[in-house]
Amino acid sequence: EMQLISSIYKLLNDSGNYDNEKIAKIFKEWNNSNLKSYLLDISIKKVLEKIDDKYLIEKIDDLAGDNGTGRWMLNYGIELGCSTSLLSSAMDTRFISNLKGERNKISKIIKQSPKSFDININSLSRAYQFCRIINYIQAFCLINAANSSYNWNISISKALNVWSNGSIIKSSLINLFYSNYSVEKILNDKTIITDLNDFKSDLIDTIAVSLKNDVSIPCFDDALNYFNQISNNSLSTNMIQAQRNYFGSHSIKIN
């Protein structure tokens, strides 16, 4: 969620059409809608915060750290065979941010001219909601896998209740999951799949804008790829199995 908001700020800021005041206004409007969240609220404050009459965010170096919880979750995802692609993308962005010397050198080779481009704010908001939902789906799948592998009995509904009170991920989206979706078996919920499919074109449009204008918005394309894969009954992995089989018997299954 932190990276999603950061990606949105970057896209809006790089468009040349949104200063910090305008970005904060958009975030405030979202925070009075079904996009309301604690993280969005603090992001509004940080976007507007000033020091010596300059916006603080524009003075902060872009080297991002981590306290290890993300790595811990990624390791569990690998151990349990669960996709945590959005978390992985967010962590990769932090790792790449620390290659400051290399980034400075490469940016001088590939010089990018200042540009101005349009962004459909309504599409951006729907793309944001799409990614947030996918992020929760991946978290729910990880919890279910842990329940199965470790004989745990974690109730996702109860976890949502905990997250909705005093957690940094507190948001109106949690209430949406409560009221609209079957959270314990989220991938079997036709309503959430239909809702995601309705938002999909907005996500594609948002990603297209970022690609055309060389703006990296981590997690957005990962959410789209996850949905395209989870909603497709024929993936490219039959070729993977064929390749693995070439190097020895890897128990390929013939339909």
Q: PLM features: residue spans?
A:
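C-terminal amphipathic alpha-helical interaction region
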Residues: N197-D198, D202-N255
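C-terminal substrate-binding/catalytic lobe of Rossmann-fold NAD(P)-dependent dehydrogenases
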Residues: M2-I217
